[in-house]
Amino acid sequence: MNILLTPARIGSLEIPNRIVMPPMTTRTADEEGYVTDDTVAYYLARAQGGVGLITVEMASPEKAGRHRRREIGIYDDRFLPGLTRLVDEIHRAGAKASIQLGHGGGHTRRHICGETPIAPSAIPHPVYETTLETIVPEEMTKARIEAVIAAHAAAAARA
């Protein structure tokens, strides 16, 4: 028997096999971060193909943390209908779902996140999206760090 195809447990979660898909950027969300039909089709194809656990690509816990165009949003309840539809389709195909929560920090760009990028320190660094640019993020205050932590907690609750 091939152990790869046998069920496994992660805590109380039972997955149908040990094939796990890691998060990979697809840029299939719309410009605001809503799940689209293309997003659902992409993940559904992997679930139908036999993946036991799919980790959906990085979703930003706050708008200021979006670091790519067409990145999934999870920073507001308005994203829940699309995310719920995505998870329901993955489950219907027999797979389990998780999601990667991530804040772009100093790798965000004002034209994507809507404000000056933030990071633990204001150290310039190169970022490549469609062109190479140097980003100098705003140094986070203790209050801003606490706000990002709270945003992650709220996003985890939505997930």
Role assignments for model-derived ranges:
Residues 1-158:
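Flavin-dependent oxidoreductase catalytic cores
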